[in-house]
């Protein structure tokens, strides 16, 4: 009887043990996190339902997604995403499971762009290209040093402007009676320019708060000293500066105002904005990690031509020289500019700007001096941006920084 009892007891114990080990895991509603990051990267916070968990990062993402041990604690998991310098978007899915088990506690989808800014987040607020006339002559000086561009953070979040490219001169001239060759319109793919300058920084140096603006000037001098009609540009955020090859045409540098990084300008002397706006302006965000040397090597504008309708009645096919191309996908904002009655061709594609802003009713109109083009403000307090500068801008209006 004792032996039988022992056998039964052992059998019952074994059955009970098997029953316990076969119990299903306690279920849980997994946390779902979806995060879209800019190229700069950053942290992703996951509030896991339990403290004991395993983090499963796919092998192909392990080089750019890691656990941020310093900031993770208890149920709070922090994933660190590195800067994206691949030149393309990337994504991954990280699963968080119960420790030693297969039960999913959280699913984290991470998508990362290869750029730091999106189109429309920064817009061109104002372009002052005409120059300020001297009281004595009624004309500005030839250097046009008090020219400026205002660039607004038109989004709802604070953004970094590091690396932003300014195209200060389009390859096409809106004041030339010309047209593109059918089937060879490069504007559908890119913006052609011949002057490129970038905002310096390492990614998180130039913070622009939501609704605030950067002022970029030709020369950051107090221009009222020589011209009482002008303005004091010494408080500008940046200036563009050129090392001239001609000692008779030298630029002026203000050491207290940071210079833009010059990538290229076709002029061998001093870069200015066209004083009638015939060469348009745009801002862009190149891929993270792209250098000036790479840009010049990889993005020349080749075999571009247009037809010029000469005043003598003849048409000429002309090459577009000394230009580089910026893919339209990089463009944050582009503004076609010129004279009201002497505007013939749009430097930028209609998808970027279907209209144009202007100063001066005709070519050479002296009434344009002291005037600029200023983007309108909507009822929500943001700048209007419909990609049509005819509607979006107040043209031929007094420059905002001229008192």
Give, region by region, the residue ranges found by the protein language model.
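The feature marks short-to-medium sequence segments in extracytoplasmic or secretory-pathway proteins
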Residues: 164-197
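Bacterial Sec-dependent N-terminal signal peptides
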Residues: 1-40, 45, 101-119
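Solvent-exposed beta-edge/loop recognition patches
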Residues: 186-402
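A short beta-strand micro-motif common to beta-rich folds, especially ectodomain repeats
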Residues: 88-100
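Short, surface-exposed loop/turn segments at beta-strand-coil junctions that are enriched for proline
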Residues: 82-88, 222
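A structural motif detector for short, solvent-exposed N-terminal "entry" segments of globular domains
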Residues: 113-175, 265-279, 284-308, 312, ...
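Short, hydrophobic/aromatic beta-strand segments
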Residues: 52-58, 158-167, 177, 226-227
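Surface-exposed binding patches on compact interaction domains or structured appendages
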Residues: 48-78
């Amino acid at each position: 009887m004792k032996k039988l009892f022992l056998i039964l007891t052992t059998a019952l114990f074994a059955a009970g043990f098997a029953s316990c080990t076969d119990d299903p895991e306690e279920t849980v509603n997994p946390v779902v996190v979806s995060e879209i990051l800019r190229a700069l990267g950053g942290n992703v916070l996951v509030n896991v339902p339990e403290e004991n968990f395993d983090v499963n990062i796919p092998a192909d993402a392990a080089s750019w997604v890691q656990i941020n041990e310093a900031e993770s604690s208890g149920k709070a998991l922090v994933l660190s995403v590195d800067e994206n310098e691949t030149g393309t978007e990337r994504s991954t899915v990280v699963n968080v499971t119960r420790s030693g088990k297969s039960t999913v506690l959280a699913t984290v989808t991470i998508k990362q762009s290869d750029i730091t800014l999106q189109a429309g987040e920064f817009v061109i607020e104002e372009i002052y290209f005409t120059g300020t006339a001297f009281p004595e002559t009624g004309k500005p000086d030839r250097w046009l040093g008090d020219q400026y561009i205002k660039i607004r953070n038109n989004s709802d979040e604070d953004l970094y402007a590091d690396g932003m490219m300014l195209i200060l001169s389009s390859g096409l001239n809106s004041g030339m009676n010309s047209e593109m060759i059918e089937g060879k319109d490069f504007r559908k793919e890119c913006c052609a320019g011949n002057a490129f300058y970038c905002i310096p920084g390492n990614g998180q140096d130039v913070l622009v708060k939501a609704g605030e603006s950067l002022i970029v000037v030709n020369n950051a001098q107090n221009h009222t000293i020589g011209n009482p009609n002008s303005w004091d540009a010494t408080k500008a955020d940046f200036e563009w500066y050129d090392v001239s090859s001609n000692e008779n045409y030298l630029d002026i540098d203000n050491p207290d105002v940071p210079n833009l990084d010059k990538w290229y300008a076709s002029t061998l002397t001093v870069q200015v904005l066209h004083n009638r706006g015939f060469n348009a302006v745009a801002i862009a965000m190149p891929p993270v990690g792209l250098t000036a040397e790479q840009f010049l090597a990889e993005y020349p504008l080749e075999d571009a031509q247009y037809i010029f309708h000469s005043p003598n009645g003849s048409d000429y096919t002309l090459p577009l020289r000394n230009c580089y191309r910026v893919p339209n996908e990089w463009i944050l904002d582009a503004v076609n500019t010129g004279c009201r009655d002497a505007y013939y061709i749009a430097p930028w594609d209609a998808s970027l700007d279907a209209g144009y802003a202007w100063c001066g009713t005709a070519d050479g109109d002296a009434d344009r001096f002291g005037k600029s083009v200023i983007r309108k403000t909507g009822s929500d307090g943001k700048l209007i941006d419909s990609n049509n500068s005819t509607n979006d801008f107040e043209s031929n209006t007094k420059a905002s920084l001229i008192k």
